[in-house]
Every structure is written in C-alpha cells, then in structure tokens.
C-alpha cells in the first residue's frame, strides 16, 4: 500500500513507493511514450499532472476535487 504525505500545496500529494522510478519527469497528459502507470494516473478524474521522484510520485489535482475520492483510485492503481 502506498504511503501518502501532504505537501504545502493542498492540491499536491506526495506518494511514497517502494521501488525506483525514472527521476525528474513531469507528465501532464496521457500518451504512448509515458510509462503505463503514469498514463493510468493522469486519466484519473481530477488529476492534472504527475511528477516522478526517486522513490515517490507527486500528484496534482484540480482544486474542486477531494483527495479522499482520488486516493482510493490511486491505491487501486498502485
């Protein structure tokens, strides 16, 4: 199960994961060049972008969406 951390930005959520990812990539739209997981996350209603760090993802959402709804979907994808 991923570990979620709040950030100073209420529309950003840090997700700690247990495996290494390609660092420093920022994704704003789904396309065939993205990793499959990133495309799945970007397609979640309310998510606007995904940033990849060494052992974490940072997901940004539209302000009108609630994290409680988005987190459930993220957990299912991870």
Where are these regions (language model features)?
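Charge-rich, low-aromatic oligomerization/scaffolding segments with amphipathic character
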Residues: 64-78
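Short, surface-exposed charged micro-motifs
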Residues: 3-5, 48-49
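Short acidic amphipathic segments
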Residues: 38-56
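Short beta-strand-initiation
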Residues: 1, 10, 36, 44-45
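A generic structural motif
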Residues: 13-16, 55-62
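Short amphipathic alpha-helix segments
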Residues: 27-43
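Short glycine-/aliphatic-rich beta-strand segments at the starts of folded cytosolic domains
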Residues: 5-28
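Short, surface-exposed beta-strand-loop junctions and turns on beta-sheet-rich folds
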Residues: 21-22, 57, 65-67
């Amino acid at each position: 199960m991923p570990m979620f951390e709040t950030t100073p930005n209420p529309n950003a959520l840090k997700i700690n994961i247990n495996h290494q990812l390609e660092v420093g990539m920022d994704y704003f739209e789904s396309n065939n060049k993205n990793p499959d997981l990133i495309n799945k996350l970007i397609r979640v209603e309310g998510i606007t972008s995904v940033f990849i760090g060494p052992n974490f993802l940072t997901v940004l959402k539209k302000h009108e969406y609630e994290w409680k709804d988005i987190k459930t979907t993220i957990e299912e994808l991870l």
